[in-house]
Amino acid sequence: MGKTLMALITAALLSTSSLVMAASVADDMETIAEHYGKVLKADSTAVIKQDLQAMRVAAVDAQKGIPTKLKSKVEDSPEMKDFRHGMDVLIGEIDGALALADQGKLDEAKQAAQDFKDTRNTYHKKYR
C-alpha cells in the first residue's frame, strides 16, 4: 500500500509541475516581444539565430494555447482557427528570417524580421 500511495503522490506532483511549467499565451507573447527587440539589434548571425529560434519556440507554444480573449470559444471555432493561422504566418516569417541568417545574410534577416510587425498588428487587433 505504501508503494501505491507514493506512486499516486508522484503522479500528482508530476502533473502539477507540468501545468506550472507550461507558459500561457501571454507569457509566450512576452518572450516573442523580448527576443524581437534583440533580433532587430543583433550584430551577428549567431545572435540573431539564437533570438529567432527563441521566438519560434515561443510561437509554437503559443499556437497550442488559447488567448484570454478566446477562452469562451471552442477549439474549432473560426476565431481559434484564425488565431492558429496567424501563428502559422508568424512561424513561417521567423523560418524565412532564420534561413537568411543561416546563409550569413544578417541585414536581410533583420529586414525580413521587420515584416513581423505587420503580422503582429493584424492579429493583435483581433485577439489581444
Swiss-Prot record:
Keyword Signal in record: yes
Pfam families in UniProt: Cytochrom_B562
Needed cofactors: heme b
InterPro entries: Cyt_b562 (IPR009155), Cyt_c/b562 (IPR010980)
Gene Ontology terms, MF aspect: electron transfer activity; heme binding; iron ion binding
Main location: periplasm
Signal sequence coordinates: 1-22
Protein function: Electron-transport protein of unknown function.
Residues given in the record as heme b binding sites: M29, H124
Name of the protein described by the UniProt record: Probable soluble cytochrome b562 2
GO CC annotation: periplasmic space
Location(s) in or outside the cell: Periplasm
Gene3D superfamilies listed in its UniProt record: Cytochrome c/b562 (1.20.120.10)
Family to which the UniProt record says this protein belongs: Belongs to the cytochrome b562 family.
Keywords attached to this entry: Electron transport, Heme, Iron, Metal-binding, Periplasm, Signal, Transport
